[in-house]
Amino acid sequence: MSSTKQEKYGYPRVSLYALMLAAAGIPLYIHLPRFASVELGIGLAALGSLLLALRVIDLVQDPLIGWAIDRFPKAQSLFAISAAAGLALGFPLLFSVTGQGGMLRLTVVLILLFSAYSLGMILLYARSATLAKSPTAPDLMRLAAWREGGMLTGVILAAMLPALLVGMGAAGEGYGAFGWALGGVAVVAAVISYPIWQRPVIKGDKPSLQGLAQAGALKLLLLALVNSLPVAITSTLFLFFVEDRLMLTGQAGPLLVLFFLSAGLSVPLWTRLANRVGGRQALLIAMPLAIGSFVGAAFLAPGQVMGFAVICLASGAALGADLVILPALFSVSLTNAGLNAALAFGVWSFAGKLALALAAFFVLPLLQAAGFQPGEANAPEALTMLTIAYAVVPCVLKLFALALVLTLPTKEAVA
């Protein structure tokens, strides 16, 4: 396949595969707390503990997945189809779980979903050099823009789909139909994206701690973990903050779409900026935007929908920079060092999921201890704790991430 055709037809297929995977990431953490508490009667503290416990599996599983992808490069088509099949089966099963034995069934299905998600994500990111037009910094950044654009489109669709399905006549809160719809998307994405997994794999050396450190990848891994925590916390608490703290009943869906739409539209802009001034400088521009958004959210009064809409636009734009620049910097560091990427991206994948699990593990029990009850009349103390968890804690974490960015080299490969 010529490089022109590869870019014309390959990047949209990459974007579609990313769209499929996105539904098992942030949207799952957005919908799962409400589904588990309302439909299954599972407490927030119990759910938070379960999600963190599942990360113990990832601690072993994700590096093993990365090792297998590096070890068996000719099996990448099988890996890609297996990941899609796991999602196609897991989504309908997840949202058909009922209260009878719900915790056990939920655990089993989440293991299936998270395993499929890990396999697909690690494969997609590890094959950046293979899927890009060329393994150079500008083309890796361009691939990242297509990939993250697909991710954000998937997040938007998955975030708003339950409400749309209810409007079309789906029963209850639309979760049953939601599961089947996502399963169908996985099947379609697997078929259409299949050709990209037929390309010869660009191989490198086996990564080691010393090699990762010399490439600057270990520092980027720490930055990725810390930087993922703020959005993990706000994603987990978004529905609660909008409906219970701001009292904007029925507005969570449109505001969530606005947030991720802003992120998606900002991706091409951050890509151009990073290629012009460097990834480090672009992040230093984006992160204060996120910090200002968290500060603004802390001072909003109930009913201030326009104020929160502005915050969604600003914080969404800042998220776009995080999503496109950090993975590209990591991929460039590995490629320049001549290292195989799959095992390294296995650790990268674990860091991102650990952030989501840590957010659920710490903030959900914290809210429950403060007496917060979703959808109920809450005491001022409970709502204050919700504000601290949603806005103040992420602000502090983002400041820490900003400090880590300042330690990056002033001249990196993405420039």
Task: Give the residues covered by each predicted segment.
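Membrane-embedded alpha-helical bundles of multi-pass transporters/translocases
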Residues: S2-A415
